[in-house]
C-alpha cells in the first residue's frame, strides 16, 4: 500500500527559502523523485535515516546539503513533511 504525502505549513514555509539558488531544482526533485519514492517505501534508501532521540519518530531525507524531515502515520498511511533546512542548521534544537 502506498503512503500519501502531506506538507505541513511549517514545511511549506521552509520551502520558500532560496536553497542557495537551487530552489527550483530542489522542488522539482522533491516532487518528481523523492515523493514517489517515499510513497512506496518511506524507510528504505541511501538518503534516508531515522533520527535518534526524537519523539515522535522522525526521519530525514538528504538532497545534497539540504535535509528534509518527515514523520510517518502508519495507521492512516500518511507521511507528514515537517521541516527543510541546510545541514548546518538542520539539527540545532
What are these regions (language model features)?
Residues 84-88:
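Short, solvent-exposed aromatic-acidic interface loops
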Residues 1-62, 74-78, 89-93:
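Basic, Lys/Arg-enriched alpha-helical interface segments
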Residues 68:
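NAD-dependent ADP-ribosyltransferases
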